[in-house]
Amino acid sequence: MIAVETTFEFERRFAELPAAVRKQAHKKWILFSENPYHPSLHTEKLHPKQRELWSFRINRQYRIIFRWLDASTALFLTCGPHSWIYRI
């Protein structure tokens, strides 16, 4: 089981998501906790690789950006639409 910590930024952005997306995100969060590399999450390391940032899909449009704190703990940094999230 993966432990998840969140930043204030993540919590703020999560609260701003449309209700239907928040519901999907909650389900994906649980799935991530059970298996962070489940195929439906499309977990990937972002470029540049040295930043150590990763993402997974909430749905086709929305993503969660995170960083590994250690082998069993992830820090969710932010979330939002694909078009916006990759500009950070």
Language-model regions: role of each:
Residues 1-4, 12, 16, 23, ...:
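Enriched for short, Lys/Arg-rich terminal
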Residues 16-19, 34:
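Secondary-structure boundary motif
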Residues 22, 26-30:
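Short, well-structured alpha-helical segments
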Residues 27, 42, 46-49, 63, ...:
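Flexible domain-boundary/linker segments
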Residues 31-56:
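A short, surface-exposed loop/turn module that caps and links secondary-structure elements
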